[in-house]
Amino acid sequence: MYSNDDYAEGGYEEYGYEMAADDGYDRSFYPMHEDVKKFLVYFCSVIKGGVVYEIQNLYENTFPKLSEQHFEKKAWPSEDEVAHLVDNDNLFMILYKELYYRHLHARIQGGPSLEQRLNSFYNYCNFFNYILPSKEPVQLELPDIWLWELIDEFVYQFQNFAQYRARLTDKSDEEMDMLLNNNSKVWNILCILNVLHSLVSMSKIKDQLEAAAAGRDPEEVAGEFGRHSFYKMLGYFSLVGLLRVHSLLGDYHQAIKVLEPIELHKKSQYSHIPACQISTSYYVGFAYMMMRRYSDAIRTFSSILLYIQRTKQLYSARSYQNDQINKQTDQMYHLLAICLVLHPQCIDESIQQVLREKNYHDNMYKMQCGDLDTFRNFFVFACPKFVSPVPPPSDAPLDDYVKEALEHQTNVFMDEVRQQQELPTIRSYLKLYTTLPLLKLASFMDHIPQDEIGEQKIENLLTHLLCFKHKMKNIVWTKGASGLEGKFQSGSELDFYIDKDMIHIADTKVSHRYGDFFIRKILKFEDLNRRLHNLKG
């Protein structure tokens, strides 16, 4: 669909607009709480002073706490109410409005109005117009968690607006006119890609990642902007944003390609934001699954799910990001279950235990028996919320077009499943034998006596056996920074060849390594024992 070359050299294009004078959320007036006033004034002062650790404390702790106390189901104070408190500080107001509109999207029932969606876009334009056209690095320091959530929210609001725009049945004539005639560039896909690629290019994050992988100092290639943590991290998070955008559009090859400088299966200095790491693995694993690279998908999902198991206490507190992490975790277990049905292989015992405890095995058995409804339900629950890159035509009938993109991707997936529908049954019979006549297997498959098997039945069986060979051979990543590279490997637990009318079968299943599992449990128990003794002491 789109390639890096389309955006890497073009430079950032500024977006102009005319912002509404007052976009405050429709609510009865109430006086601003004193603690909210103090927070806003102090927040502005620490951002001006560049005190990153204090900015992070206010952003991660104080702002959510005040939101819970005073703004659970209503908007934060409007721009007009806040501006005079902070002496109309332009940069702070841009950052405040980023949080303001994010809160509207997350907490207000029914979501923001069209005008608020437009003004949120204009506010992002203000922010990017402030940092991107600058001839020298701007004097702004923000914690990495805010930079990640800013890029993540930017892509989310694009996705949310694309779905809102595709739902024509609940719009007034005035809203339709605003959407079709006056705001064609608002939340436009080319604008989103332009911003993300510009951040990647300005930060030289790809050059830095390649230098680090080669054992060189990234500072040598970082350039004037990339040496600053602010630009470097925005560039890195924009790569993940591009992964998400291309996945939402169904361009899975490009989704993996944009991450080429990142060694997906290795930890790095950039993986310290859990939400970013988990989101990356979710979209990478999903893209691999849709590209029929099941081994890579299983490894990606298993690795991140093990990480989540070890750090799950971090995601217990209620927050938007933690809710998103918990949802993506559930989605990844569903996707892992699909991959294991289509491409059985050994996985970590602790992941297997979760699949058993949460009753995934019952549904996996249904999928192994060819239950297409279970496949579809798992996919629809676990897949991203796909969007169309363009709005419905201006002369389109008033209808709800939101599900068109989802239905298209679901049909693509289900076509692949139908091709493999007979394979679990074939596998179950082949596992019982070392040699098996074609005639006998055809009899098993069709549940009829061997003497009633005709030439057409044998031809159909040979087609299914060839399909088995083909589907069980995948490209698997082995080394290198490109997640698209790899070697063809057979992932089946058994292999076979056909000599005349006889199938010869070899079991290649690797036995479970229970020793490693028990060693880990023993070490964990000993560590727990030591801690208990220390508490007693």
UniProtKB/Swiss-Prot annotation:
Highest taxon of the lineage: Eukaryota
GO biological process terms on file: formation of cytoplasmic translation initiation complex
Record-annotated PCI domain positions: 300-512
Primary location recorded for the protein, binned into one broad class: cytoplasm
Subcellular location: Cytoplasm
MF terms (GO), sorted A to Z: translation initiation factor activity
Keywords: Cytoplasm, Initiation factor, Protein biosynthesis
InterPro entries, A to Z: eIF3l (IPR019382), PCI_dom (IPR000717), TPR-like_helical_dom_sf (IPR011990)
GO cellular component term, pick one: eukaryotic 43S preinitiation complex
Similarity comment text for this entry: Belongs to the eIF-3 subunit L family.
Subunit composition and interactions: Component of the eukaryotic translation initiation factor 3 (eIF-3) complex.
Matches recorded under PANTHER family: EUKARYOTIC TRANSLATION INITIATION FACTOR 3 (PTHR13242), EUKARYOTIC TRANSLATION INITIATION FACTOR 3 SUBUNIT L (PTHR13242:SF0)
Xref: HAMAP family: eIF3l
Protein task: Component of the eukaryotic translation initiation factor 3 (eIF-3) complex, which is involved in protein synthesis of a specialized repertoire of mRNAs and, together with other initiation factors, stimulates binding of mRNA and methionyl-tRNAi to the 40S ribosome. The eIF-3 complex specifically targets and initiates translation of a subset of mRNAs involved in cell proliferation.
Protein name: Eukaryotic translation initiation factor 3 subunit L
Organism listed in the record: Culex quinquefasciatus (Southern house mosquito)
